[in-house]
From Swiss-Prot:
Its EC number is 3.4.11.1, 3.4.11.10. GO terms for cellular component: cytoplasm. GO terms for molecular function: manganese ion binding; metalloaminopeptidase activity. This is Probable cytosol aminopeptidase. Its main location: cytoplasm. Belongs to the peptidase M17 family. The active site is at K286, R360. Presumably involved in the processing and regular turnover of intracellular proteins. Catalyzes the removal of unsubstituted N-terminal amino acids from various peptides. The gene is pepA. NCBIfam families: PRK00913.1-2 (NF002073), PRK00913.1-4 (NF002074), PRK00913.2-4 (NF002077). It is an enzyme of class 3 (hydrolase). GO terms for biological process: proteolysis.
Length: 503
């Protein structure tokens, strides 16, 4: 799909190109109380009051997400107009903008339009510039066009005909908007990879498959890839990681991807993704109902791979290392048992009270491994706890950090990227719940504050660098009729890295 930019100040009568330029459809916004947006006012004048008459007749009330096509419109180059309800003008925020953009794309994709002019990016949204609107609109479009059909005997072809979108932006934002297109396409490609990996079944997306995916990313984008096998993991003394992997016939992999966009001496940001490609719970077996969704337990790994792919396509001037410990968590005669004690790469001994709290067991060794890069920051991403879902639901990812500055950067990025996160507590008092009579610490701290104690466990392995943890158990995938991986938190992570790179 082709995206382009055209500067236009509707308030100064600069809309001639849009009024005469050929297009299948122009998208206009209408607020409640019959208020026309700037672009809609110009088109209304060119069409001799058509938009006003439609609104006055009650055919378009401006309620958020409502759409109305006006066919065969005379006086402008576009053959039709799509009116999109924006809701109340004084409540028009980022969510309202995304709702409007999504509604517009859904309506357009159901038609045979090929070229569209999109004016909504210029709407005032929480002090964001129109280049922000361009990026958000492209991501909304790519979200609507994403389909996962490759596992069907007859994959479904794309049902839409849309090929070209022209965005009108404020003239001062033209240069930034062109950058926004590049970033949005790269980000959408990274999200698609993340979603594909999450949606693949566990018998396809194995640890070996993730390793091969990392190698392909490295080959396609000029990254350096290291994929360590069982013997190398054993040599590193990753006893905690291996305690999870031991009962599966699928060999574990320890994946490291290096992206160098800055000077070699510049400290990298390290992203660590939990890669449990299927989680039965091990000996602490999960209930059978809904266990199919445990293929999504590698979405942390998928988001890290999707992010570094997006970063490489954007060409960000920053160094990034992606680390993915990946294995299955299976029951078996040689599986780790509740009460077993294992030794982590750091040397801390861990009493495994519940084998279904396995994500932290593979992450802790990866977090120790990250020390060798002398990182500027380390962010781990994991579908870690059901407790986080209970606390935050499916809207916000849980953010935990021992570093206020890093947490602030991530929260700013989450707001900019429309990928919400909520900071959770990480007080020292919670550490007491991890005490063990027999080892240095236990892998669970009981039911109270389960998401917090999981993060506390990880914090024991992160003392040498700024660290944050994203619990995406509630945001990595959706159930029900819209079942599937979401691609989150790739937008948050990518925006954080864009900000760090100053781009």
């Amino acid at each position: 799909m082709d995206f382009s930019i055209k500067g236009c100040d509707w308030s100064k009568g600069e809309a001639k190109g849009f009024l005469t330029g050929k297009s299948d459809c122009i998208v206009l916004g209408i607020f409640e109380a019959q208020t026309l947006s700037g672009a809609a006012l110009d088109i209304d004048t060119a069409t001799k009051g058509l938009i006003s008459r439609v609104v006055k007749a009650g055919d378009m009330d401006g309620k958020r997400g409502k759409t109305l096509f006006l066919p065969e419109v005379s006086g402008i180059g576009a053959s039709r107009v799509l009116l999109v309800g924006l809701g109340k003008q004084d409540a028009f925020n980022q969510k309202a903008y995304n709702d409007a953009a999504t509604a517009a794309w859904r309506a357009l994709l159901a038609t045979k339009v090929v070229q569209v002019t999109f004016s909504l990016a210029q709407l005032p949204v929480d002090e964001r510039s129109s280049d922000w609107g361009v990026r958000a609109a492209i991501l909304a479009l790519r979200n609507e066009t994403y389909r996962f059909t490759q596992m069907k005997s007859k994959p479904e072809p794309a049902s839409h005909t849309l090929k070209r979108v022209v965005f009108s932006v404020d003239p001062a934002d033209e240069k930034a908007a062109k950058v926004a297109i590049k970033q949005a396409v790269a980000l959408a490609n990274g999200m698609d990879l993340t979603r594909d990996l999450g949606n693949l079944p566990g018998n396809v997306c194995t640890p070996t498959y993730l390793g091969n995916t990392a190698k392909k990313i490295a080959k396609d984008w000029g990254l350096k890839a290291e994929v360590l096998g069982l013997k190398q993991i054993q040599a590193l003394k990753m006893g905690s990681f291996l305690s999870v992997a031991r009962a599966s016939v699928e060999p574990p992999q320890f994946i490291v991807l290096h992206y160098q966009g800055a000077a070699a001496k510049a400290a990298p940001v390290v992203l660590v993704g939990k890669g449990i490609t299927f989680d039965t719970g091990g000996i602490s077996l999960k209930p059978g109902e809904g266990m199919d969704e445990m293929k999504y337990d590698m979405c942390g790994a998928g988001s890290v791979l999707g992010t570094i792919r997006a970063v490489a396509e954007m060409g960000l001037k920053i160094n990034v290392v992606a680390i993915v410990p990946t294995c299955e968590n299976m029951p078996g005669g040689n599986a780790t048992k509740p009460g077993d004690i294992v030794t982590s790469m750091k040397g801390l001994t861990i009493e495994v009270l519940n084998t279904d709290a396995e994500g932290r067991l593979i992450l802790c060794d990866a977090l120790t491994y990250a020390e060798r890069f002398k990182p500027a920051a380390v962010i781990d991403v994991a579908t870690l706890t059901g407790a986080c879902v209970i606390a935050l639901g499916g809207h916000n990812s849980g953010l935990f950090s021992t570093n206020d500055a890093l947490a602030g950067e991530l929260l700013d990025a989450s707001r900019e990227a429309n990928d919400p996160a909520w900071r959770m507590p990480l007080d020292d008092e919670y550490q007491d719940q991890l005490k063990s009579n027999f080892a240095d610490l236990a892998n669970i701290g009981g039911r109270p504050a389960g998401a917090v104690t999981a993060a506390c466990f990880l914090s024991r392995f992160t003392e040498s660098y700024p660290w944050a943890h994203l619990d995406i158990a509630g945001t990595a995938w959706k159930g029900g009729a819209a079942k599937g991986a979401t691609g989150r938190p790739v937008p948050l992570l990518a925006q954080f890295l864009i900000d760090r790179a100053g781009q």
